[in-house]
């Protein structure tokens, strides 16, 4: 579906659910969210349309949360960008992108390889919220109201994002029962369980709970198997920054409605869209709703039961 098809009442491009007037006339907002113990509990993840869980230095992960269909009163903690964000933001057209910390080296790929408008806490702190109940450097949070206002000041846009995935209410033909999924990273674990209505997330052995007391949930869970390249860059602790390659192809596992479809993801170039295919070349459709994508290094396989 093209972005032009995102009209009020029509399918939202990032969820497949009916679109609101506000969502039909604004770009996506990407936000870099921390995902280590010091950042917990996080906020706003259950209002994100799509969340990408991405490997970073030290075997941990960091999130790129994409907001569009809902207004959100609080999300975070917001942290620094990584090179892979540019490749994902390119899928969202003229998006806004919020992050904090890092260096101009982190910002380079965003400005060079995406059409996103960056909003950096270090430069414009007035667009962000500081919460004292989290320790430094996990205190920076945001709201859609403040960041959309900031984005409009910098790059006025009424263009919604193109669709990243396809959506359909019907269950894919040939889907197998699979109610539990674990994505094991080098130093982090994301585990999902189907409860009959949605997938609930555990992280590193504990229920993944948010500030509002809800457990992280999703309508769909997608596990993408990707190659990971050494960027040669190092973080402030001297640890090498990895680059998960989300341009190319690899295995994919799609979980919806307590079922699984295995196939292939394909994105042949930076400008190309992301496609999910079954083994016989049919498009894999997600259930309308919110989606988490576990971007898992191809040296590991998801555990499924």
Residue ranges and their predicted role:
Residues 1-7:
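Short, low-complexity, disordered segments immediately C-terminal to signal peptides
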Residues 7-48, 57-305:
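A surface/extracellular/periplasmic glyco- and lipid-processing/surface-interacting theme
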């Amino acid at each position: 579906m093209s972005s032009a098809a995102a009209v009020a009442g029509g399918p939202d491009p990032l969820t497949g659910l009916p679109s609101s007037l506000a969502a039909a006339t604004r770009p996506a907002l990407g936000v870099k969210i921390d995902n280590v113990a010091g950042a917990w509990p996080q906020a706003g993840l259950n209002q994100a349309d799509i969340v990408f869980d991405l490997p970073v230095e030290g075997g941990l992960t960091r999130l790129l949360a994409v907001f569009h269909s809902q207004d959100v009163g609080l999300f975070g903690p917001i942290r620094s960008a990584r090179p892979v964000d540019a490749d994902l933001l390119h899928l969202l057209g003229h998006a806004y992108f919020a992050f904090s910390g890092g260096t101009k080296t982190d910002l380079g790929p965003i400005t060079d390889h995406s059409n996103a408008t960056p909003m950096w806490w270090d430069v414009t702190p007035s667009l962000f919220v500081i919460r004292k109940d989290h320790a430094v450097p996990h205190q920076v949070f945001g709201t859609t109201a403040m960041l959309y206002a900031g984005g409009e000041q910098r790059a006025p846009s009424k263009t919604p994002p193109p669709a990243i995935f396809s959506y359909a209410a019907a269950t894919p033909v040939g889907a197998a029962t699979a109610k539990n999924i674990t994505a094991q990273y080098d130093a982090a674990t994301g585990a999902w369980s189907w409860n009959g209505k949605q997938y609930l997330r555990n992280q590193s052995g504990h229920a993944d709970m948010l500030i509002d007391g809800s457990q992280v949930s999703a309508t769909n869970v997608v596990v993408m198997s990707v190659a990971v390249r050494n960027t040669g860059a190092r973080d402030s602790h001297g640890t090498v920054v990895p680059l998960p390659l989300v341009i190319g192809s690899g295995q994919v596992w799609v979980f919806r409605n307590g079922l699984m479809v295995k196939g292939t993801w394909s994105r042949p170039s930076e400008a190309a869209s992301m496609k999910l295919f079954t083994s016989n070349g049919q498009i894999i459709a997600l259930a309308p709703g919110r989606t988490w994508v576990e971007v898992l290094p191809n040296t590991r396989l998801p555990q499924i039961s």
